[in-house]
């Protein structure tokens, strides 16, 4: 049976019956699933694959499916919590070690998360428990740093969500239309988060504090897209799905899907129930601003 590394996706070298192993590719030592058969192991690898592809909602759902069969599965609880926090492991160019980056920071500490506590409680041995605790402590420090930066950010009125580049790395039309919306709204005196401009002086790994602050403060999200696959692109969906989660606890928030050159019936199912706007219609900006006041 093959177990894939949580850090890089390489094969884990382990002794049958062991609770942890070392990746043949990146050298990381990590806990491993206690899978009795290949089918269950494939479910772990699938969930892990989703997380490494930054498809965090799919990863959480996959781990929760495993937990439906056994809610004492420490490795599934751990997979669920690092997926919920959007943990991606990237290579440190200096040390070549894999370090965690957090793409979905939460206000509550990872150390108080129910899945983390369940992983520690149900760890199969002391070494696995130690690995969970040490890794969670690393993530908690990263979390503190992100929250400290985001606390200094002024609140936003609007968050614009869109796909910046296409499959060839070229700027999308969506980006151009999003910029038009950005200027139209800022002219009205609104503070707008538009990543192309808002994040232009930030480094890639420093994006999350500003995205987190903007998502949590903005009362309106505008999701712009011209293709179904752009609405469903990993980072686009990560933003609007996070905002939908916030809307569940704050009914004053508003999300407006804005489409162009596509059938509105092709919007993602989660967005299809919301009042959308056709960007090609005359008076689109006026209708958009009117939507803010509803």
Regions found by a protein language model. Give the residues of each.
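Cys/His-rich microdomains that often coordinate metals
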Residues: 9-12, 30
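Short cysteine-rich clusters marking metal-coordination/redox-active sites
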Residues: 5-8, 23-26
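Short Cys/His-rich micro-motifs in 6-15 aa windows
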Residues: 27-36
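Short coil/linker segments at helix-helix boundaries
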Residues: 86-135
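Conserved N-terminal substructure of TIR/SEFIR domains
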Residues: 137-224, 244-254, 261, 282-294
């Amino acid at each position: 049976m093959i177990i894939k590394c949580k850090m890089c996706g390489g094969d884990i070298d382990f002794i049958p019956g062991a609770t942890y192993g070392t990746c043949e590719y990146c050298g990381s030592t990590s806990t491993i699933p206690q899978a009795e058969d290949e089918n269950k192991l494939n479910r772990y690898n699938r969930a892990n694959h989703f997380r490494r592809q930054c498809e965090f909602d799919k990863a959480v759902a996959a781990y929760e499916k495993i937990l439906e069969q056994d809610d004492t599965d420490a490795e599934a609880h751990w997979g669920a919590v690092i997926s919920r926090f959007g943990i991606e492991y990237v290579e440190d160019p200096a040390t070549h070690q894999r370090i965690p980056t957090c793409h979905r920071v939460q206000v509550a500490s990872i150390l108080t998360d129910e899945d983390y506590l369940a992983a520690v409680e149900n760890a199969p041995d002391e070494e696995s428990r130690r690995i969970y605790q040490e890794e969670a402590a690393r993530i908690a420090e990263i979390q503190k740093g992100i929250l400290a930066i985001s606390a200094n950010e002024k609140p936003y009125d609007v968050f614009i969500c869109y796909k910046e580049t296409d499959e060839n790395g070229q700027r999308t039309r969506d980006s151009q239309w999003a910029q038009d919306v950005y200027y139209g709204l800022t002219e009205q005196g609104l503070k707008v988060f538009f990543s192309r401009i808002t994040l232009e002086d930030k480094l890639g790994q420093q994006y999350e504090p500003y995205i987190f602050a903007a998502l949590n403060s903005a009362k309106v999200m505008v999701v712009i897209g011209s293709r179904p696959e752009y609405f469903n692109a990993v980072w686009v969906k990560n933003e609007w799905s996070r905002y939908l989660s916030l809307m569940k606890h704050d009914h004053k928030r508003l999300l407006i899907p804005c489409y162009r050159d596509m059938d509105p019936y092709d919007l993602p199912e989660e967005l299809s129930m919301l009042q959308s706007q056709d960007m090609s219609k005359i008076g689109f900006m006026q209708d958009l601003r009117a939507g803010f006041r509803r």
